[in-house]
Amino acid sequence: MNKLQLLGVVFAKVNECSLELSCVRYCDPNLLLTKRKEFLHNAFVCKYLCDSLLSELQHFSCTNGLTACKHLAIILENLCEHFYVINKALCSFEIHKDHQQYYRTLFDVDQCSLHDPIKISFVNKQDLEITLTDFNEIERFLCKLNLIFPLIDARSGMRIISQIYDRLRKFTGISPLARLEFYKSACGGCYLCYEELQMTPNNGSSVQKRLNGVLCEHVTYTKDLVFQENEYLEVLREDLKRDNLLREDMRTELDDMKKILSNKKERGFYVPEAEQLLHRYDVFTDDIPNYIYTLSDLTYWSKTSEKIIKTMNMTMQQLNVYNNNMIKLKRSISRALNDIEVRDCFDVFEKVVDKRHCMFLGSMFTSSAKIISLLATQCLTAFEEKAVFERLNECDALCSTVNTILERLKSASGDGKEGITKQDFQADELIKGYNVSDEVSVRKKTYLNKVADKGYSKIVASLSTEERSIKKLIDINFLGTLCIDMMVKLEKMFYKRSQIGQMVENGVHLLALCNYDNHLYIRNNLSRQSISTENVNGVIQHILSFLCGPIFTHRHDIFPMPPNIDMAYACDNANVLPHRKEELMQCVNDITSVHGWSISSYNTFFKIDSVDLNTAHAHVWGYVKEFIVAVTLYNELYGQRLRAFRVDENTIRECGLYLTYNSDIPLVLKTDKNVIYGSDIYSILYAHMHHA
């Protein structure tokens, strides 16, 4: 078994323990005290794993960018922390026997340390504090870091990543489910939502408009969970019977709950005779009578109505009665098993939330799909309770019409074609005269039916449209690994930059090999050159590939995209203003004249002054452009094959010139003989020509 397989095994076991501990927090502490020995055993095992693996996991995620290592480190730290908190709360409960205080301690109800600001220090001597309150804000913040990463010193970047790690760890907790306060249902999407939208035509809409209201399934994601109440009650009955715990009162309660679940309010019925008649006709039948088309239409609408009714068949009263009965049954079972009345977290805080709010918070005994069905039923009920629709029932009218057609078909001779037309099945009994009062009555009822039909169709359409958002709000949301993955990519980049000092420890400083005259020699020669026309687009794309952060790397895919796509994605997700995008492209495209690309003086490459953030970022664009253009012209002029690398994407093993994005050591030249480092692009090119 290799290390990755071993990591997977440990991860699975730790996840299992984490899930069980997250459930233990809701249990009655009296029951937990009876299993104190097993609880402490698991706590010591987790402490041992944390002490043995944590530092290695952290180091491995820094050097290799493996998300699973960072995720496992988060869970291990949280497990040890929660074991300690639960054990401390148990010790206090043994003395005071206070259920409320026990649960308040476990869930940090009385204190909050989750919203401390994150401090950012830029290389232009500017500081910033940002407060992150949920996973979505962390994702947006990491997208901004991805864009302006050259403006953050490597060590400062590692400190920022450490703060984000602590914040993510606290938000994640030990449960695989996301807490409601730490994610937004409709957040405007994440960077993966943005990429998915780029695969479809925009139809002239802006990115922000298309992302508005998008339900993100990456930061947190929902799963279709099946919970069949009737089957659950049957399994519960069999378990109790097997353990000889099925008393008469429990049997009665189980039967009552099954009756509640099966007691559905039927609205109308469906006529099976119509289906039998329609079954005789297929695509090869010639001369299908008009009344068959009418019957088919009416049967379709009748079945549609019936389908809606069957789906939305639970009332608020049924839900409350069912929940109350389940609570009674739970207490009966707990008394039978433990000889005491168990008071878990839901019992202690039962009266904190009223019945109406329970519909939105859900229930431990009812599936979220049932809650969503109840919401839909409430919408339709509210619509039908309006006075104008009190006497209108779409399903009854449809079924009545279907029955009328069938009766006329039975009374008709032969196959029913004699004298039967489509008009016979319209509401002709309403129009028996042509006096004004009857005409008004007919028109009024026709109008009301039309309004009712439109009202029903609009409500059903609205429910279908909002189905995903309702599910996202009420369903169980699992934590995704998106934020951890983004953090690991940025951490790997900052870590590699922070190791430059050790990598060049035995190298040669540029000032020991070259002087100002060497700088002028290369600079003057390159200033007389210009990039050939056929290479201009390639150089521009090369510049953009050095400006992109580590999160968007489609240029390295199996079927790679050009670097300008990565840059566009980075700018859009960092919410860069349009005029700044234009300034970026103007800077990158200005490479044909020496005045457009040569900006650094002697030994000042990648030195950024104390200016505002936008100006400092523009300086970074200029330095990266100068780096790429200078290497390109140097190769063309002197016939060299010097390659340019990013230090975060390549280790300093291959021969070439590396850009580190660090102000103290921005350039590292790796040759067959030695390593040369310094802060002057032209002098280091001279060193390559004479000392490589």
Curated annotation (Swiss-Prot):
Bilayer-crossing regions:
none
In its UniProt record, which GO terms are filed under biological process?
Answer: viral DNA genome packaging
UniProt GO molecular function = ATP binding; zinc ion binding
Q: What does this protein do?
A: Component of the molecular motor that translocates viral genomic DNA in empty capsid during DNA packaging. Forms a tripartite terminase complex together with TRM2 and TRM3 in the host cytoplasm. Once the complex reaches the host nucleus, it interacts with the capsid portal vertex. This portal forms a ring in which genomic DNA is translocated into the capsid. TRM1 carries an endonuclease activity that plays an important role for the cleavage of concatemeric viral DNA into unit length genomes.
Q: Which family does it belong to?
A: Belongs to the herpesviridae TRM1 protein family.
Keywords annotated in UniProt: ATP-binding, Host nucleus, Late protein, Metal-binding, Nucleotide-binding, Viral genome packaging, Viral release from host cell, Zinc, Zinc-finger
Zinc fingers (C3H1-type) by residue: 190-218
Its cellular-component GO annotations read:
host cell nucleus
Protein location: Host nucleus
Binding partners and assembly:
Associates with TRM2 and TRM3 to form the tripartite terminase complex. Interacts with portal protein.
Q: What is this protein called?
A: Tripartite terminase subunit 1
Coiled-coil region list: none
* Binding sites annotated in the UniProt record for ATP: Y634, N635, E636, L637, Y638, G639, Q640, R641
